[in-house]
Amino acid sequence: FARLGRPWQDAQWLSLHGRDPAPLAQRLQQRPSALAVLTDPSRGGVDEVRQSLRSSGLESAYALWLCESLGHSSERVQRLAPCQATPSDLHPLHLVVLLAEAQAAPPADQLPLFGLEDGVFLQHSDRPGLMTKREVRIQLLAELNLPARGVLWDLGAGTGSVGLEALRLRPQLQLLCIEQRSGGSPLIAANAARLGVQPAAVLEGDAMEELPNLPAALAAPDRVLIGGGGRKRRALLEQVIQRMAPKGEVVIPLATLEALAELKPVLEAAKYSVKVSQQQAWRGQPLADGTRLAPMNPVLILKGSAPRQDGA
């Protein structure tokens, strides 16, 4: 870190020396600000680090510094751009330092229509990695069955990734984002600007307290994503059901069976049509001369569709 002119106090360390690179992929999901990776000239080397960055969609989120033969006359420290090949004369004694970079806003018209990489979104500095991952986000957007127009609530919006990507797909939607975490509102607003979209409202606070005070135009949602709620999730779902527009739908990603067991009866009691599924994805990670599939956390998805009213 002295060679890079950067303090080391906030740095994390990880050894891949002769090891499976899977722990590196897991650590990258936490989005450390600085990560020193002890590498190996064979297995667990700089190429495995680069492959892990690509597989995680974070290649542009980190500056990769290759440090060779430190403290010797042949010492060499250089930054490798994503498009730059690994040096053919790589010294066997080397390590890699990854430094998080503030990413420039990508041109909105150059982004893909669907399935944005995780690295596109700015994240909470105190909880990096706390966002809906791309694979889950794609599934949630499909489950929301987005209408061309209407009101979409994203409750417990986090970085705003799901709601904002929905707004790119359906620009005529009125999007309401509510996030309780401090700094959530400016973060979502910044991500909206990066994606070239404009939510109808972004609120910072407890959803249970914010919903009763919504303007009339946003008071009856056509689609709702509940990404948070914690211990209040049952009461929050009950309030959503009371406010749902005719033919409305609610989608709830869950981490535990207990949460599913708590919320599913609430939808059934309201005569909602209920669907339960699980999203499980794997990402390719380097393994020796090949590729292994590293599992991501499974997510349960609970979906409820409001009962049709007579004549609907």
PLM features: residue spans?
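Class I SAM-dependent methyltransferase SAM-binding "motif I" and its flanking Rossmann-like core
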Residues: 1-31, 208, 269-294, 298, ...
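A contiguous loop/helix-start segment that scaffolds small-molecule binding in enzyme catalytic cores
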Residues: 33-128
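Active-site capping/gating segments
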Residues: 71-95, 259-261, 266-310
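Conserved class I S-adenosyl-L-methionine
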Residues: 149-158
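Conserved SAM-binding loop of SAM-dependent methyltransferases across substrates and taxa
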Residues: 159-171
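Helix-to-beta-strand junctions that scaffold the AdoMet/dcAdoMet cofactor pocket
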Residues: 170, 244-246
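Short beta-strand element of Class I
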Residues: 172-176
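S-adenosyl-L-methionine
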Residues: 178-220, 232
